[in-house]
Structure formats: structure tokens, C-alpha cells
Amino acid sequence: MLTFDNRFLRELPGDPETSNQLRQVYGACWSRVMPTSVSSPKLLAYSHEMLEALELSEEEIRSPAWVDALAGNGLMPGMEPYAACYGGHQFGHWAGQLGDGRAISLGEVVNRQGQRWELQLKGAGVTPYSRMADGRAVLRSSVREFLCSEAMHHLGIPTTRALSLVQTGDVVIRDMFYDGHPQAEKGAIVCRVSPSFIRFGNFEIFAMRDDKQTLQKLVDFTIDRDFPELRNYPEEERLAEWFAIICVRTARLIAQWMRVGFVHGVMNTDNMSILGLTIDYGPYGWVDNFDPGWTPNTTDAAGRRYCFGRQPDIARWNLERLAQALYTLKPEREIYDEGLMLYDQAYNNEWGAVLAAKFGFSAWRDEYEPLLNEVFGLMTQAEIDMTEFFRKLALVDAAQPDLGILQSAAYSPALWETFKPRFSDWLGQYAQATLADGRDPAERREAMNRVNPRYVLRNYLAQQAIDLADTGDTSMIEALMDVLRKPYDEQPGKERFAALRPDWARHKAGCSMLSCSS
């Protein structure tokens, strides 16, 4: 049986009203809310790694009582469901109160190692923060969130996790592209897991409302529970050090997104974790043909605010909004300027280390920058697959560089032929730089393969899993969970999961373009 220790409820002010009725909630960090039951829950998938972390057995999670709990139809001992209150800047503008509109936390589990895991159901029904929505989630978006949460973890990227995927047996109406064509889709619920789901927006809402008392309580609680290393810091220094840690963690997170070609798609401040975790897997995508301007989110297609190449700048902008909120408690500008400067330094250091590792150099040198910028430009113009390119680059013999090794990363044979001479020139320069670096070739190859994944959750693969799951077949979900456990290994016999995006998927909904509809 799990041990719950629901500190968020116990130590922070709550909403006195207990109904699920839509409302503005003031002076409270959370509202008690019961999940809305579903008709016929069915457990489709679960994460073995999260079961182990929570100290749950497969027998337990498959039991009717646990399936009911994961579907919102019942509670296990110690569970106290609630929805959190927060606001946020969305696409650069303050959006007011947002909150958990369809996510309902069940409580905080503490395992025998003392690790704290908050369990949260996404798609479990209406809360006071649902605005005009129904509080539900569709199978399509739930499969994507379940798969990507665990895929990112195995890539070594800080992330919230996923315990389970449950089909509800109910129909949910969604207009996938907001074009006036709503359709009935199957409902589902993901149980997300994280040490904390606190976001930048949790702090912003109280600052915007000039509720300094609640804001201070939330800051003190967050530091005490989630940043124990700061408990003994002098009070006058604690907030500055805390903000600095958040800035550095965020910088490192974004550099890791960029390393593997992950595009979040909707980096609003309510989707930014205070712990520096990847949170809220909505219209995310993985870069296929390299393009810094690519965004998977149709809502962002015109402005490309959240495109691949802008993610570092957007993260900094979001940190500025957090600084703005904290300034109401401690109006000392230098604290926040120092934190933001640390973000810049941490990102540049981490990104330099990422680039050196991806290209197989022993360390970053500024002299590499023109060489790397040139190939990124070539990859964009020639439509070169990012994941395949870096994996094959590890096979290049610097003493006898063979351009043919890289050809499998090209989507267009015609474009490859056009840019082949320039790639050949670049490869010669790269080989010279590699030889000058003096690294052992075998060591270089192994090091590159540790940071350049063979397998990522390509957009079309996720869509194939969704299409099959819609027919009741979860085999693709299971196959992807299996192969993505070891994304840096070759895994003979599983090469099809590393295949480039096929032509049919280039403009297919769910494969190249997604919306916030979920």
C-alpha cells in the first residue's frame, strides 16, 4: 500500500468551497475536487519503471481498485483529490486565472527511499478552473503524453513522468484544428507523476492579484519541500539563491531539448516547471528535417513564437515573468538580473558542451562555431534529418571521410545532389578539426553515440500508435515503450523505429502539424 503525505494540501491555503463549479479562486493555492466517474475504464498501458519507483506491483495496478483509481472512479487510502490554482502568460500575454482545468492531483506518495511523487490524473473531469472546457482528454493526446513522458526520461532529459494510460469508455467531442469540424473521439486519462507540478504560473497569479501573503507562503513552501538544500540559507539570501537555481536548471533543460531536437510547442509560463522539468506534453514534436524555424503547433504557425530555434530565448522571457512575480516580495532588481545572467551563462556553457559532444570533440572551442553554423545551414537547406545525421556522423572516419555515410539522412535525393559539393567541403573541414582534436576514433564514436540517440519518438510513430490504439490494439504503444527504453543503443531488429519520416507523413495531421486540441 502506498504511503501518502499530502503536504501541498496540508501546508498551503485552500479554497473553502468544495464544488466543481467554475469560479475565480482567491487566496488559495488549491481547490478540493472529486474526479468525474467514467463508464467503463480499461487499463491500456503502464510504465514498469514508474511502478518500481512507486513500489507498486503489476498485480496491484491491474487490480479493479487501482484501475478505478486511475480512471477517477474511486480513491485508494490516503488519496485527497484537488486542483491547483495558477495563472500564466500565453503566447506573450497575461491570460489571468488558468489552473488545473482537467488535471486532478490525487496526492503525494513517499516511497521507502524518501522520494516524493505526486500523482495527477489528466482528463479526470471538470474542476473550478476548467473555464469553458469539459475537463476530459482524448485518446490521441493521452497516448502522446504517456509515450513522450517516458521517452524523455530514458533520453536523460528532466521530465514529469507517466504511470498509466486508461481508456474511459466514453466519447469526447473535439474540434482538432479549431476549424468548425468537431468529431467524437475516445476518451482517456493519463496518470502523470512528478516530484512537483508547481509552475511559474503558480507564483504569477498571486503577484498579479497583489496577494503577497499567499505568494510568500507558496515560495516558502516550495523552497522547504522541493529545494531542501536551501532550508538553512540565511532568509535574506534564500530567494535570490532559489531564483538562481531555477534559472540554471531551466537553462540546462532547454539545452537538452535542443540536443535531441525536441520542440515543446507551447512554452507558456503555466507550462514551465519550477523544478526545471519538461511538463505538459501537448502539441510537441521532434525535428525531422533540421529547421530552426519549425513548430509543430498549428496555433503558432504564423508567429512561430515557440519554434525550435527560439526555445532558449522564450525560456529566458518566461524567467523574466517569474522574476516580475517574485519582485513583488523582494523588490531588489539586482537579484533577478544576476539570476538571468546565470541563465545566459549556464545555457551557453551547456550548449557548448552539447555541441562538442554531438560532433565528437573532446571539448568546446570557439573556433568550431563557424564550422557548426555552416553545417546547420546546409542541413536546413538540404532537408537533412537531424537524428540520422548525427548518428551517422559518428561513423565517419576522419582519416578517410566518406560523404556517402551521411546520405541516408537526406529526405530529398535531388536536394542532396544539389548540396553534395558543399557537404563534401564541410566534411573535409570537419575531418581536419577532428584529427586536430586528437581523440581516439573508437572513443569518439562511443561518446557521440551516448548523446546522439538512435531512436526518438518520431511524430509519425506516435501517430501510428494512436491509430492502432483507436482500434483497440496497444501493440505499437508497447513496442515503442520497449525500444525507447534504450534510445542510444542500436537494438538490432528494431531499425524500423529509427526510419526517417515517410513521405505520407510529411503533411499528415498528427505527424507534422498538431494543435492544442486534446
From Swiss-Prot:
Cofactor section: Mg(2+); Mn(2+)
InterPro entries attached to this UniProt entry: SelO (IPR003846)
Pfam families named among the record's database cross-references: SelO
Binding residue positions for ATP: 99, 101-102, 122, 134-135, 192, 199, 280
Residues at which Mg(2+) binds: 271, 280
Keyword hit for Manganese: yes
Catalytic class of the enzyme: transferase
Catalytic residue positions: 270
Record's catalysed reaction(s): L-seryl-[protein] + ATP = 3-O-(5'-adenylyl)-L-seryl-[protein] + diphosphate; L-threonyl-[protein] + ATP = 3-O-(5'-adenylyl)-L-threonyl-[protein] + diphosphate; L-tyrosyl-[protein] + ATP = O-(5'-adenylyl)-L-tyrosyl-[protein] + diphosphate; L-histidyl-[protein] + UTP = N(tele)-(5'-uridylyl)-L-histidyl-[protein] + diphosphate
The entry's keywords: ATP-binding, Magnesium, Manganese, Metal-binding, Nucleotide-binding, Nucleotidyltransferase, Transferase
Record flagged with keyword Manganese: yes
EC number: 2.7.7.-, 2.7.7.108
Listed GO MF terms: AMPylase activity; ATP binding; magnesium ion binding
Family statement drawn from the similarity comment of this UniProt entry: Belongs to the SELO family.
Biological function: Nucleotidyltransferase involved in the post-translational modification of proteins. It can catalyze the addition of adenosine monophosphate (AMP) or uridine monophosphate (UMP) to a protein, resulting in modifications known as AMPylation and UMPylation.
Protein name, as recorded: Protein nucleotidyltransferase YdiU
Species assigned in the record: Methylobacillus flagellatus (strain ATCC 51484 / DSM 6875 / VKM B-1610 / KT)
